[in-house]
Amino acid sequence: AGNIIGTVALMPTKNKLVFELTKMAVKPEYRNKGIGKKLLKKCINYSKSNNHSSIILYSNKKLNNAIHLYRNFGFKEIKMEKKSPYLRANIKMVWIND
């Protein structure tokens, strides 16, 4: 008991109604057990209960499992800025609270 097996972080942006999913990871030996789903669901429920308008995230398209998970939770790909804030990011996604 008490072992950390995953992490997630939501960070406020300049727009107080928009949060960024800045970190989400699950230890390799605990993957494909629904932990990522639980972490992402917590973030979405937190955003809903605090009336946030949306969650944005940056990722890399080669992270197929992560992109698939985000899409399953309603995240949609949107246009990325010319200068990405993250060196390895090549996809930007948004979840809209409706």
Question: What are these model-predicted stretches?
Answer:
Residues 1-23, 27-29, 40-42, 46, ...:
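Acetyl-CoA-dependent GNAT
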Residues 16, 50, 58:
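Residue-level signal for short amphipathic helical patches enriched in basic/charged
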Residues 18, 33-34, 87:
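Non-catalytic, surface-exposed connector residues within folded enzymatic/regulatory domains
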Residues 27-33, 61-62:
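Active-site acidic-Proline motif in GNAT/NAT acetyltransferases
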Residues 38-55, 69:
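Conserved acyl-CoA
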Residues 53-98:
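C-terminal "cap" of GNAT-fold acetyltransferases
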